[in-house]
Amino acid sequence: MAKRIISQNRGRGSPTYRAPSHKYKAELKHPRVDEESTLNGTVIGIEHDPARSAPIAMVAFENGKKQFIVVPEGISVGEKLSCGVSAEVKPGNTLPLAEIPEGIPICNIESKPNDGGQYARSSGVYATLVSRELSKVVVRMPSGVLKWFHPKCRATIGIVAGGGRVDRPFLKAGKKYHKMKARAAKYPRVSGIAMNVVDHPFGGGNRKHPGKPTTVSRNAPPGRKVGHIAARRTGKR
């Protein structure tokens, strides 16, 4: 009898396919600050978070609260940081986009005012403020796309720490396995034609070939719905 294929097993939600979110340290957001005020704090620690590729910093603010933030390059323990309209334009400080000069690298940009930050948060990435108008600010994203934001959306000055991560090779399959395991990603990924006949519709045979058409109906049952799903055409154009 055939076994469940990986996509079916993943849908069941066993621990193998569930992210270990109980190990994740914190949800990184900008601190809540009134529009006209500024909040100061001190970096008291820099830590690794299994949930992300960049290091995170614990900041103790003057209002008595402690919070993890996205840490830019050049920030160290004991550094003084500020968040608000009157904060100095320097790496680590958080300001509204309306107060940031053009050409400055920024990270952890809010999608809408006070949502905590949504864009440019991965290690080594940054966006650049291109131009400013009365009702919108234009930012060049890490992908090169130009995106419009509300002037009251906040961003952190600087480039996210941990740059060069993708340039360093894993060297061992075991290290890649543990990296993918922290994200609940299945690794290594075996192609269907390399599997046994009980594991995949394309498995089995004396050589690597699907053995049947790779196009499949949109209404095919889950164990058969692999390959080119409801494809209008296949092959090179």
From Swiss-Prot:
Cellular compartments per GO CC: cytosolic large ribosomal subunit
An annotated Gene Ontology molecular function: rRNA binding
SUPFAM superfamilies cross-referenced by the UniProt entry: Nucleic acid-binding proteins, Translation proteins SH3-like domain
Region of interest (Disordered), ranges: 202-237
Keywords: Ribonucleoprotein, Ribosomal protein, RNA-binding, rRNA-binding
GO biological processes: cytoplasmic translation
Segments of skewed composition (Basic residues): 225-237
Described function: One of the primary rRNA binding proteins. Required for association of the 30S and 50S subunits to form the 70S ribosome, for tRNA binding and peptide bond formation. It has been suggested to have peptidyltransferase activity; this is somewhat controversial. Makes several contacts with the 16S rRNA in the 70S ribosome.
Protein family membership: Belongs to the universal ribosomal protein uL2 family.
Assembly and binders: Part of the 50S ribosomal subunit. Forms a bridge to the 30S subunit in the 70S ribosome.
NCBIfam families listed in its UniProt record: PRK09612.1
Protein name, entry field: Large ribosomal subunit protein uL2
Annotated source species: Methanococcoides burtonii (strain DSM 6242 / NBRC 107633 / OCM 468 / ACE-M)
